[in-house]
Amino acid sequence: MDDPLKFFEEQKIIAVIRAGEHSDADAIAKALIDGGIKIIEITPSVPQFTKLIENLAKLNQVLVGLGSATDGEQAYRAINVGAQYVSSHYTDKNIFTVCKNNNAVVIQGAATVTEAIEAYNLGIDLIKIYPINFLGEVPYINRLRRSFPFLKLVPSGGVTLDNFLDYIKAGATACVIGRNLCDKGLIRAHQWTEITERAKQFTQKLESLKVAR
């Protein structure tokens, strides 16, 4: 992927995979891709998460990254096998340094205006506003963007099919979507086709916005 940041701006949907079995995570990834999702985030909770990242990184037109990173060592391992971005819930300078030294996009979390500005000043590419469902939801993103239009914001935590487009219209660069795409019940029941259908609902909704514009 020549320009990952532009890809985030175009695709808008970041799908997060959490699973207790590697085979389940692999099946989820395939189901999401079948549903039109092109940005996939693998968390360290997935057994052999670097193996899955490596396999997904070989696919054309799929951007894969590490999510919920907690330290620079995790970030390096993921980037070393093909991850093009690393995301964490908070600002961590070690993760930031690893990403910048290895030409990977860095997404780090913020909750307050001060944290968001500090993240921007540090040089973080995308600022994850987390958990957005406890921070004011769409109006909070709208206010942040109105006051600080230079911030590239990625709401996470509680983004649903019903409010997804509202976040995009409010100025979010992209949205992180986890349980509303692949909840634990679907994973336990191996209902991969339902995950594909949910993915299609999100991607079709995004297409409807693009057409309207």
Across the structure, where does each feature detected by a protein language model lie?
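Ligand-binding grooves and catalytic loops that recognize ribose/phosphate and carbohydrate rings
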Residues: 105, 111-118, 122, 191-201
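Glycine-rich beta-strand-to-loop/alpha-helix junction loops that act as flexible
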Residues: 66-67, 155-158, 175-179
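Glycine-rich phosphate-binding active-site loops on the catalytic face of alpha/beta enzymes
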Residues: 89-95, 128-137, 172-191
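Anionic-ligand binding region
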Residues: 113-127, 137-140, 144
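Catalytic beta/alpha-barrel core
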Residues: 16-18, 38-46, 63-70, 83-91, ...
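Aromatic/hydrophobic pocket-lining residues that form π-stacking "cages" and hydrophobic walls in ligand
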Residues: 28, 95-99, 115
